[in-house]
From Swiss-Prot:
Details of cofactor binding: Binds 1 [4Fe-4S] cluster.
Name of protein: NADH-quinone oxidoreductase subunit B
Cofactor section: [4Fe-4S] cluster
Organism field: Ehrlichia chaffeensis (strain ATCC CRL-10679 / Arkansas)
GO MF: 4 iron, 4 sulfur cluster binding; iron ion binding; NADH dehydrogenase (ubiquinone) activity; NADH:ubiquinone reductase (non-electrogenic) activity; quinone binding
GO CC, alphabetical: plasma membrane; respiratory chain complex I
Lineage, uppermost ranks: Bacteria, Pseudomonadati, Pseudomonadota, Alphaproteobacteria, Rickettsiales
The protein's assembly and partners: NDH-1 is composed of 14 different subunits. Subunits NuoB, C, D, E, F, and G constitute the peripheral sector of the complex.
Catalytic activity, EC: 7.1.1.-
Residues annotated as binding [4Fe-4S] cluster: 52-53, 117, 147
Protein's UniProt keywords contain Cytoplasm: no
Length: 179
């Protein structure tokens, strides 16, 4: 399926040569387009379940939603994963472990924050022992709201991450442009 909003397809060469059946583009744009497409359709998330949101995260891997058919395969090791799904209440004691696991992931790496506790502290926001959002520890690409969010909401968040990777608008590209 061709996305008509792609920057590769909407450049001046595509507009002028579309009717002739071929496309002229820069080689680097084509390589970026293909690599982003491949990355977005083969996500390997690592679960970082901390509370009740982890149960909903497990539902997405079960037979009803079956993320395997979308190219999403859960991994147990951070060295094999490229997506971290943080689900649940992040405490001050667990924050260094989250950062350590995030640092062990290979580039490019993405983070999905799942649930109101991971997004901003949730119900325990005013507790002395709770981090008020995992984005204070690791850069987050997608926020999935809810308490707990449904499996459909996480599935939608994964689809949004795939679209974001296709556009090239993720934390890995933001970091390289800031240097």
């Amino acid at each position: 399926m061709i996305n008509k909003n792609d920057s590769v397809l909407n450049n001046q060469f595509w507009q002028s040569y579309n009717h002739q059946g071929f496309m002229v583009t820069q080689f680097s744009d084509l390589i970026n387009y293909i690599s982003n497409w491949a990355r977005s359709n083969s996500l390997w998330p690592m679960t970082f379940g901390l509370a009740c949101c982890a149960v909903e995260m497990m539902h997405t891997a079960a037979s009803r939603y079956d993320l395997d058919r979308y190219g999403v395969m859960f991994r147990a090791s951070p060295r094999q994963a490229d997506v971290m799904i943080v689900a649940g209440t992040l405490t001050n004691k667990m924050a260094p472990a989250l950062r350590k696991v995030y640092d062990q992931m290979t580039e490019p790496r993405y983070v999905i924050s799942m649930g109101s506790c991971a997004n901003g502290g949730g119900y325990y926001h005013y507790s002395y022992s709770v981090v008020r959002g995992c984005d204070r520890i690791v850069p987050v690409d997608i926020y999935v709201p809810g308490c707990p969010p449904t499996a459909e909401a996480l599935l939608y968040g994964i689809f949004c991450l795939q679209q974001k990777i296709n556009r090239g608008n993720t934390s890995i590209t933001r970091k390289s442009t800031q240097d």
